[in-house]
Amino acid sequence: METEAVDVAVAVARKLCSELIAAEPLGEITGLVSDCFSHLVSTPHLVVRINDALYEAARAQIERQATQSGFEGRLVILAEPSIASGDCRIEWADGGVVLERAAIEAKISELVGRYMASRDQAGRP
């Protein structure tokens, strides 16, 4: 019964996530970009890679965020058809960050599976 409850909860979370990203594909992207700008104000170069269908809307928002945050470096925004809608890659000279929903979902599935397996091995119902 517990396994089924966990499966239902994960399925609901996936569905909700998909619906939210479909409704607001730039929501998480602009949040992540804003966080990067707050920590990388003096970075000389920042590259944001996004889905090509979101390019125009994202470009305007990201450029506005750069100005508001005081970012003075070179900002490059690239449209990439291989990046899923709602995902992005942000890169700078010393690092970067990736928002990739498929990888997040895979990690969640792995962790839930491990948790349930450990409960089964411990003899819990």
Predicted regions and their residues:
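Elongated, mostly alpha-helical coiled-coil "stalk/stator" tethers of large membrane protein machines
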Residues: M1-P125
